[in-house]
Amino acid sequence: MDDLKAKYLGQIAEATDENALEAVRLAAVGKKGEVALKMRELGKMTPEERQVAGPALNALKDEINAALAAKKAALGDAALDERLRSEWLDVTLPTRPRRQGSIHPISQASEELTAIFAEMGFSAQEGPRVDTDWYNFDALNIPGHHPARAEMDTFYMHRAEGDDRPPHVLRTHTSPVQIRSMEKLGAPLRIICPGGVYRADYDQTHTPMFHQVEGLALDENISMANLKWVLEEFVKSFFEVDEVELRFRASHFPFTEPSAEVDIRCSWDNGQLKIGEGDDWLEILGSGMVHPKVIAAGGIDPEKYQGFAFGIGIDRLAMLKYGIPDLRAFFESDLRWLRHYGFSCLDVPTLHGGLSR
């Protein structure tokens, strides 16, 4: 017994890994190990011999199992120590920077133009995106036969048979907010109405949903000269140029009379737009003097008050200023695109600190 004990305890002590230790266990206390074979020989012994050999073999087996367990624990601790040394992590190193969100270019452009018009005394007003066709069309002097009222251009809300409520549409412009503001605030009035609008169109420069800002100024003795000054100041501030030349072209809009589309002098240098210089012209907005019928629809006397209005595509402004080639990219939720074109949430646009940085 002493020889077996010395033999296997020595082998256990010399085992360098769990595979070697398992081999010792099988040779010593496995089903075919030496201790197991000795146990089988107990049947051949006399009762007196079994009384001496049995307890001694059990004690040897227990001692070997205890040594195996202790050695296995020691090998496990050693392996863990080695793993910790090889996979050491310096907790004093700075962590990977956490990504911050960024401001979408449309939101940035909206904030910038709101700041510009606020300096000129315009307040921002909002209205429902689902509105009646009266606010969206009739109140704006858009007759029933006008092409804009066709279902191919306008999203109409579904009505069940027998539903006699007035037709509702997804607003095709933010002009309904002008009517609601006239009803609510009266005159004199200076407002802008930024927000999302909807039209049934989709290509590189059109999407079913886009953003507009429309402006309205009502007062006594307002003229096209006031409109021209406001638009010039806006364009200079938004594109951050000292001088700008605008060209007013006669046009037709049902809600203004006279009406004008406004172009801006510009040039293209290797695909880069330069505002205020060059021989090219770029259309940027529509405008005009508010039609008397529209003023009357807002509950204001058109004999006493006149006004001007303008409409600008915010998405188009953002494309021109930030060099974005495809309008559809605004709505594709591509984080890589947003990280490239997005703005810091801490850069609040002001005319004093600079609009976009």
Curated annotation (Swiss-Prot):
Keywords: Aminoacyl-tRNA synthetase, ATP-binding, Cytoplasm, Ligase, Magnesium, Metal-binding, Nucleotide-binding, Protein biosynthesis. SUPFAM superfamilies: Class II aaRS and biotin synthetases, tRNA-binding arm. Mg(2+) binds at residue 257. Its cofactor is Mg(2+). Its EC number is 6.1.1.20. The keyword Cell inner membrane does not apply. Binds 2 magnesium ions per tetramer. GO terms for molecular function: ATP binding; magnesium ion binding; phenylalanine-tRNA ligase activity; tRNA binding. The keyword Metal-binding applies. This is Phenylalanine--tRNA ligase alpha subunit. It holds the Pfam family Phe_tRNA-synt_N. Tetramer of two alpha and two beta subunits. Its main location: cytoplasm. One of its GO terms (biological process) is phenylalanyl-tRNA aminoacylation. It is found in: Cytoplasm. One of its GO terms (cellular component) is cytoplasm. Disulfide bonds: none annotated. Transmembrane segments: none annotated.
